[in-house]
């Protein structure tokens, strides 16, 4: 990915993380660049009214395809291998994944149970890649990558109805 585009995505992600933190957290400590990049967390702090400290890795709305006009709110993109072939964010060190939503502001899902659930699904399918063309509807739990763009990442689309069966919190702000 070209550096200017990365910086733009990074800035947009940081603004979203600040939005989440300002509305929902107290005693915020921001991750260093290395912690964000390699440990996969944006900030640590406690949810308002809770004294326990957690690490959070904030995720924004996603389009199924970059060329799509609108963001979608049907499935969550879950990265288990990053663009350099290292561990993806679902294998990182955050405790909670706050995911921006359309139907309500945020869903927080515990990272480790999400990975355990996803890993079981991947093993059941023997890590089967999607056979669909980029413009066809996304296939839940099929493995996608962006090798065409020179990336070594692996990710799946997980329906929110399945995410909501895991331990989660819906936030109104």
What kind of feature is each model-predicted range?
Residues 3, 7, 18-50:
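A short acidic/basic microdomain associated with nuclease active sites
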Residues 3-8, 29-31, 60-108:
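Catalytic cores of nucleic-acid endonucleases
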Residues 5, 50, 102-173:
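Non-catalytic C-terminal interaction segments of nucleic acid-processing enzymes
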Residues 13-14, 33-35, 168-173:
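Accessory terminal regions of nucleic-acid processing enzymes
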Residues 13-18, 111:
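A structural signal for well-ordered alpha-helical scaffolds and beta->alpha junctions
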Residues 38, 69-70, 141, 158:
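Short linear motifs centered on Gly/Pro in flexible linkers and helix caps
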Residues 40, 53, 94:
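Extracellular structured ligand-interaction cores
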Residues 43-66:
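Conserved catalytic cores of phosphodiester-cleaving nucleases, focusing on short active-site segments
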């Amino acid at each position: 990915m070209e550096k200017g585009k990365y910086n733009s995505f990074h800035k947009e992600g940081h603004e979203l993380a600040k939005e989440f933190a300002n509305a929902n957290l107290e005693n915020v400590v921001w991750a260093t660049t290395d912690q964000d990049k390699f440990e996969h967390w944006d900030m640590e702090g406690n949810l308002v009214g809770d004294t326990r400290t957690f690490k959070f890795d904030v995720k924004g709305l996603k389009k199924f395809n970059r060329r799509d006009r609108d963001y979608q709110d049907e499935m969550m993109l879950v990265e288990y291998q990053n663009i350099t072939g290292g561990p993806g964010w679902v294998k990182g060190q955050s405790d909670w994944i706050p995911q921006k939503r359309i139907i309500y502001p945020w869903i927080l899902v515990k990272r480790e149970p999400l990975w355990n659930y996803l890993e079981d699904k991947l093993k059941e399918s023997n890590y089967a890649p999607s056979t669909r063309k980029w413009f066809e509807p996304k296939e839940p739990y099929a493995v996608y990558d962006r090798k065409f763009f020179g990336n070594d990442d692996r990710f799946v689309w997980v329906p929110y109805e399945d995410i909501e069966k895991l331990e989660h919190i819906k936030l109104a702000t």
